[in-house]
Amino acid sequence: MEEDKIRALTTTLKPNETQAQKLLKAHIAVLVSALGGIDKTSEIVPPPYKLGHDALACLKDIKRWIRAVDERQHNYEVALACAESGLVQNDLIIILCQWDSQMQNKKQKTDTMVRNKTAMEKIMLSCLEILVLLTWPMEFGTNLSENQKLLFAQVRKIQVLHKKHILTYNDGQVLKAVIRLALPVIAKTRIDREPRDNQILRLVLYFTRNLLAIEPENDSISTKTNNKRATPSSNLPNGVSPDDISINNLLRVFKKNKVLMLLLTITGSINSEFEKDLFNEICLESVYLLIKGLEAKDVLVNKPTSTTKMNTKTAAAAATTATTATTTTTNTTSSVDISATTPLQPLSSTVGLQLQDLLNTEAKKRQSQKQHIATRHGKFGTLLSIRSADANSYVVSGEEALINSNGTMDKLDKSKTWKMKNHFTYDSDEFVKTNSPIYLNAQGRQILSYFIEEFLSGGCFNNLIESMTSKLTSQLEYSLIDELTQASYFYTIAWFLNYQREQITLSGLQTFDFGVVRAALSEVNFILIVAYFRDSHQKRLWNSLHVAMICFKELLHISNSIFGKKRARTTNDDTIGDDEQYEIDRELAEGIIRKLFSFNEFLNTLVQVPQIAYKHSPRFLAESIRVITIILKSFESFAKEDLQLYVQTKRRRNKKKQQRINELDRDTESKLSTAIYESDEELAQENLREVTRERKLNFQATEVRFFHQNVVTTYIEYMSRFEDLTHEDIKMCLTYFHKLFVVRKDYNGLFRLDFMQLIYKLRNHLPKGSPIRLKVDEFIYYFMKKFKLAITRFPNPLEILFPRFEETRFKHYLSTGELYQLDTAVDPRAIRNLNKEVIDNDYNDAVDNDNNNDNYNEDDEDGIAFEIEANPEAADNHAYDLDRLDELESQLTNYQSRNKNRSSLEKGIAKKRNSRKKSTKTSKVNSDGGDSDDDDDDADAAAAAKAHRKRRVPRDLLFEEPKPLRSAEFINDSDDESDDEKNAEFFAREERLRQLLNQTGNITDAQKLEEFKKVWQQYSKTGGSIMQDAVANAVKEVSLFISDGDDDDDDGNGNENQKGKRKRTRDEADDFDGVSTILDSVQSQVLDNGSSQGNFASDAEVYHASSNTSDTELETNKRAKIDDAEEKEDEGKGEKEEDDNADEDEDEDEDVDGEESFPVVHHKKKRAIISDDEE
């Protein structure tokens, strides 16, 4: 009785296998069996593959299993079951190749095939879908489940096996069959294509991408704790050789089956015939995987097939190894043919190239050993005893210890047990290198070179980059782009820029033609690279940062090569054309530099990256060293060319949301702030100088930042691997040290024990007589000469054991032996801030003392002295003509008048404002919307200046010549004693007026003034002769109402000014509801006082002074205390004058003419104080 196979599959378990896994594999095996198989009954040789009755349904079921288990449950069980059943190599590949052969051979086409054409295409598409799912590249990361991590290595080997079968079966006919599915889609126009057609084309491109992405894992080393022996584990499955999956075989198969042509077709028409959003990312990744791990010069330069002398046996062994691995490498002719049908050459195969590298490494080691091997007379054994200074003895054996003292100490060091920490991690090479080294033979080089030339000349590169640029600049799509896509974009740009630059260098052309890569040099691309560089550093994405450094380095190389180009000397006919081309190239180079070095934050990132580079992989470290080298070289070129760069410094806004000025709308506040700010000429010029100083890039100051001790440590770490470096790399490090030590004369920067030991080992390693060793010897001689001088000054230099501190005092002390003293130069800005702070402190103390007094003495000069100090500009008139301030001031006045709180003041007492609270509030209000610089001192000064300007009365109220504000007048008070006397007189009169205003109210608009005048005229007519005389004397005494004859002494301009000011006063006034109340109070005072002209005049003076905008009225207010000032001035002479009202008018007219500039400033002070108190 036969055994049931299904029962055996479901009951017999393998080690570490669950029942569910066994059942799943049984289901997949049943589906694969029902799919079809080889028809052994057919007479055709080889026998064809015969599909089952429900082949399409079986393929759909397998696809459902993959998505349901592997994708949704994060497992690889279905993929392993398909590999165990041989689905790919025994079914899918054969089905696709057989269908392609039938479609290609027109003679075998029958009516049955034509009738079943649609069904066969569905089956082929289902096969393609399963192939794409099973070959989808995997990445080992934290997002994998525990089961996926356990099966990751096994599934990776299975994918490598699938790649081998796809490329080797009928010389890659599977790719040809897949492209045949895409041909009908490509033949359609863009309008006629349906979404299903685009999906078919995407499947074809994804399948191509998967083949490029599949590569074996890194060689892993497993160390056992018992014997500490390292056992390498194979990363290739059984039956797969490196040549089967190498880039050479891949390029050959792609060329033969028109895959490269398909890629060129789609990328060349990606913006016209194909949707860029659907195909640009896939095409970009395919191109990126083609060039990943390759150098541009390796594609351009044809290297010889053998660089070392290989004997016949070695070559035959290499050929045998290569031919046994694959059946396609049987032809061993030495001729090179770019035809895709020509098999790979054994001597130039992957195995042969690996053998050549091993032989080259062995030759280098033998050459280094020959320098230290003793003669044949010394090979009889050696035993040395070394006694140290502390009487300890060390024994060294071997003839290597007899060569020199260096060999003796090295032999002694090798006998020690070192526990060296691994200072670097391989966390930054994922996007720039492959898991296994790439060896490109002659045939693969020619195929790839032809593809790249077609890719550039056909405009495919520009189309692809432009489509990806629009996607990266879109905010919605940018969030969906992963890290790999961004890295592939910038790495592709860097690689093709390097390719074009190397091609120009090798061709010897005098012009720099970068038209084929113009999309990479666009302005948008520069913004993207700067943002990508900065974001990668901030997010600590070291793989992305590595790619960003490569792209940034290539851009600098292009600019530096153009700057290094000399103007060609030609005949007169060619001079004009060459000069134009030279200017075009120079403009390109300057544009690159200006766009790259346009942000101060990006410069800070460039300085910070090399300081931590030694903690990462050697490739990352080498790339950072090259970036620093090209930056320093570029700075030298810029300095020679006198190129001026300006760096933009970002201004940060205050975090607190500050209140706007008097709750005005934003537009009005912006106009007011701009107008007042632009009125200050000196401050505007100072701010302009500051912006220019901040933005202009100082090459010397920026260059110093790249000589930080952490950067020096990076160079030392890089050169410590001198055994793996070329002479060019060593020379690059020596150039940096020479610039630091010799050019900049920063001796203490290299007085380090690790550097001394490194330079000594490097000298012994380099071969004698080589040019690089001569340079090392010269540097060591100069270094030791300076070190001896330094050691005499510091007998016990402990500083050489550690890196130097970068503080200025330490650097100064180590360089000169003297203590560092701060610069005693006086900063004018500091003096201005200090004086202002002192004035504010005195002002606050005076306010605190005055707040304790209930009453205010108008004759107390000490009590009002603080207002003179708080307003040092009181003695000057700084009236400027500003536009649109009349309208803005009217809005401001309207708001203040509506929000006055008249209950805060008692009648008869004028309280001073609380300066501490008000000043804080005013500063907050006036600083709204202002930007602050990075410097805290500049921010404070700017905020104080803005607050002072916004509190200033608009200067277009007077038509006078503008007078610039001087710093000395802003800080220091006037030395003239007469100014103090006049100020005291004015503030005494002002306080008196304020008391009267508080008692009777205010006149704030023209309407109320007119009503007030009518009431007074009515009183003068109906009140009798006494009332009429009192009103006439009050008008004459106080100049309450301006008549035509009052301005006889003024010139025409003065009359026009006064008319203009009265007109603006009426425009600025707003409605006030308390007119009737004021008139009642005036009427009661007039009736009570009767014929008292003095009291009536005082009341009139109160109403007159309350008009906040008339200068003539303010001039009249000052006449109240002129007698007191004259008495103080003539006190020494003993003359006291008692004049009547007519004599006072004559004397006061003279004083008013001399004090013409006072009313505006004091009027501003009065308004500010009154509005604050009432508020």
Swiss-Prot record:
InterPro entries: Timeless, Timeless_N. Residues 930-940, 1044-1053, 1137-1156 have a biased composition (Acidic residues). Belongs to the timeless family. This is Topoisomerase 1-associated factor 1. Residues 1078-1096 have a biased composition (Polar residues). It comes from Lodderomyces elongisporus (strain ATCC 11503 / CBS 2605 / JCM 1781 / NBRC 1676 / NRRL YB-4239). GO terms for cellular component: replication fork protection complex. Keywords: Cell cycle, DNA damage, DNA repair, DNA replication inhibitor, Meiosis, Nucleus.
